[in-house]
Amino acid sequence: MSRGLGDVYKRQAVQLACDKITKEEIEEMKKAAEDFKKILKSKDITEIAEADVRFHDIIYMATDNQKLIQLLNNLREQMYRYRVEYLKREEAHPQLIAEHAAIIEYISKGEKKAATDIMCKHIDNQVTTVIDVIRTKQN
């Protein structure tokens, strides 16, 4: 279900991160995922969204590909709106935590296919939720 250039860029970022990520960046991802988990308890959607952005930014920076990072940054505002809608659904939070853990695991092991698959699932879940929100608002 993934669609759009942003999805393509994110998949590329995950694949490059599998090749280039450092031990320090893996530790940063783990810390960002833990911070995200803690911030979820605050129910402050802005803080939660910013914590999620920090997690994904570590992946993007790990690519060491300035052009790709720039392209993803250009899409940041559009992606942020969708992210906020998704993060408002508290029932999705346990799944997000699990997906972040799986992304860390597969990137740290350099398992490109598994990392890409989980990132696609992560994106698809967000897209599906946003579509549901739009449909609900229309009715």
Residues covered by each model-derived region:
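Conserved amphipathic alpha-helical segments that form helical-bundle/coiled-coil interaction surfaces
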Residues: 20-85, 98-106, 114-125
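Single conserved hydrophobic/aromatic residue that forms the stacking wall/gate
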Residues: 1-6
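Short arginine-rich
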Residues: 124-133
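…primarily DNA-binding HTH/wHTH and HhH modules…
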Residues: 135-139
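Active-site loop of classical SDR/Rossmann-like NAD(P)-dependent oxidoreductases
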Residues: 91-94
